[in-house]
A protein has these predicted regions:
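Catalytic cores of carbohydrate-active enzymes across secretory and cytosolic contexts
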Residues: 1-176
Length: 176
């Protein structure tokens, strides 16, 4: 199932970096596919003695989230029941209930779905879309995370995708 793939990317990714001695100060998630890395980092901070709330703040301070999908249908969402199957023990390790963990990805308290984009945005200090228009669409799409904010002040910026041709293209191809 897709959820297991994302667990491997997120949690496994952090553990793989740690295993080879790499300890980034900032993590950048592209869309929600590796979003569970935020939960692994929360668990690490809790293991070091922080409370769950303090761990969220520590993770947030070292996280950036890029959203690529400007339509709800393109965002990974998982049934709460499936999430609970894989993360109830994880919540216990963090000294919290599964309900507290689920809230990171819920659109509202009654939602039975975990939304990876919402979790990514809640666990990031900075967020952006991949073009100016996409930033505008994303601010509208995710405005409910910042109630009371005018749409233009929702803290989702933009970085336009692109490449620097001289450093991207090989010399052989450039000579063509």
């Amino acid at each position: 199932h897709r959820l297991r793939q994302e667990i491997i990317l997120g949690i496994g990714g952090v553990r793989a970096l740690r295993a080879v001695g790499i300890h980034p100060q900032v993590f950048h998630t592209n869309e929600g596919h590796a979003g569970f890395l935020g939960l692994e980092r929360i668990r690490e901070w809790v293991d070091r003695g922080l409370s769950f709330v303090e761990a969220i703040e520590a993770v947030r301070a070292g996280s950036v989230f890029t959203t690529h999908t400007p339509v709800p249908a393109g965002i990974d969402q998982f049934p709460r029941q499936l999430f609970e199957r894989y993360f109830t023990d994880y919540a216990t390790q963090c000294g919290i209930t599964i309900d507290q963990l689920v809230t990171l990805g819920q659109s509202n308290p009654d939602s039975d779905t975990l939304n990876m984009a919402l979790m990514g945005l809640r666990l990031a200090a900075r967020a952006n879309g991949v073009a100016r228009l996409h930033g505008e669409v994303s601010r509208q799409m995710f405005a409910t995370l910042w109630p009371g904010f005018p749409i233009k002040e929702v803290p989702i910026g933009h970085v336009t995708n692109g490449v620097h041709a001289r450093s991207w293209v090989s010399e052989r191809v450039d000579e063509l």
